[in-house]
Each structure stands twice: as C-alpha cells, then as structure tokens.
Amino acid sequence: DPTVLQVGINLGNILLVTGKKANGDPEGIAPDMAAAIAEKLGINVKFNTFATPGEVADAAERGEWDIGLIAIEPKRAEVIDFCNAYVQIEATYLVPEASSFQKVEDVDAPGVKIAVSERAAYDLYLSRTLKHAELVRAQGLPGAFELFKREKLDALAGLVPALRDNAADMPGSRLLPGRYTAVKQAIGTRHGKPALKAVVQAFIADAVSSGFVQGLIDKHGVTGKLAVATDD
C-alpha cells in the first residue's frame, strides 16, 4: 500500500521505545522519528513491532517493513541498506566489585567468560573483535543478567544505561570506565529502495543538525543515556 509507511520497530531497546500509546502504538524516540518521516512523505505510518533487533533484521528479508529502526551492524547490512545513525549508546562491561579488571581492555583475556544478550549489536561486535575471552549467550538483556549472576561469570556485556540499572539491582558490582564500542542506532530501508533511502538520509541529517533529535531525547526522558550520533 503506497499510502502507508510500514515501520519495523525493536521493542527490546527500552531507550528508543519508552512506552505504549492508548491505541497500542509504540511510544518513544524511534516511533517519533518514523512518524516524522511518514509525515515528510505525506503518508500514514503503521508500526510492526518485534521483540528483538534480530527479528527486525529477519523481517526485512520477508518484506515486512519499508524502514526499520535498528543499530548499524555489518552482518545486518547484508539485508538492510543503512542510512546514517541518529543516536548512539556506549557499550561497556559490568563486573563484580572484587574483579581485577579496571578498564574495558582488561576483559579480553584467556579464560574470561562474558555474559551477553544473543544477537545484540554489541554481541556481533564482540564476536568479531575479542581475541581471548569467551562469550556466553542468553536470550535478551534480562536473560544475560540472570546468567551473569547465576553462573558467576567474569563480566556482563551491555549498554551503559541498562548496565547502570543492573548495577543498582546487584550490590557489589561496578561498571568499567571507557567503551569497547558505541552502538549506532540508525534507520535502514530494504535493499532496492534508493528513492526512499535518499529521503530518509536527508531527514536524518536535518534531524541531527537542527536539534530535532536532541529534542526527542529530552522529551522522552533519556537525557544522559542516549547521545546524538557523531561521525566517529
């Protein structure tokens, strides 16, 4: 239906989808960005929601959305044409208070076991970059946190805002300073949609430079947890 923009939304990112409207539509920065793009195109918006980013990526192959709001990741680029990022979230580790680790780089050592949410952008990143440490995967962030506690693993990989919440729930744990990556949250189109991609790309550039994105960060109460994307 050319009068409707089908949008793939990842409900698993609680910073970008912060709630639900009375009509059941998702609420937050990601839905607001998508709605603004639909408005620019002069068409209606329809949200197709998924529990995890991996499911959003899988749905691209089935043609279930026109634009998807999901973190940029080389593996996902096989099925998605990414535009530039609009926000970024830094990723680090949560470790036990008594851990010898003092900075992010210390964690990649032989024998180290890291709990991680399966197929999260930082799981894909760490899978490519870790030389020695072993990733132990669980379903979703809550699952990775439980695994970390239950199995007494050496570290929990995650995004700073979520790890802060985990640390508050787990006395005797601390976040390592620094980051191993910043997850870039972007908007992508399915392959073979160059005209739509051009519109989205132009919209993001304007939204970042005009302060529209920062305004959404403030509006949805995630200031200090999300940052407007940088080019690095």
For each feature predicted by the language model, list its residue ranges.
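Extracytoplasmic small-molecule ligand-binding "clamshell" domains
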Residues: 1-71, 76-78, 210, 219
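Short loop->beta-strand "edge-of-pocket" segments that line small-molecule binding or catalytic clefts
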Residues: 4-11, 27, 105-120, 134-135
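Alpha-to-beta junction loops
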Residues: 6, 42-44, 61-70, 111-113, ...
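Periplasmic-binding protein-like
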Residues: 11, 87-98, 160, 164-205, ...
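Short helix-initiation/N-cap motifs at beta->coil->alpha
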Residues: 31, 46-58, 101-102, 136-150, ...
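A ligand-binding cleft/hinge motif common to bilobed small-molecule-binding domains
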Residues: 54, 70-79, 125-128, 149-181
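Flexible hinge/capping segments at coil-to-helix
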Residues: 84-86, 95-113
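Ligand-binding clefts/hinges and TM-proximal coupling segments of bilobed small-molecule sensing domains
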Residues: 121-138, 175-176, 205-232
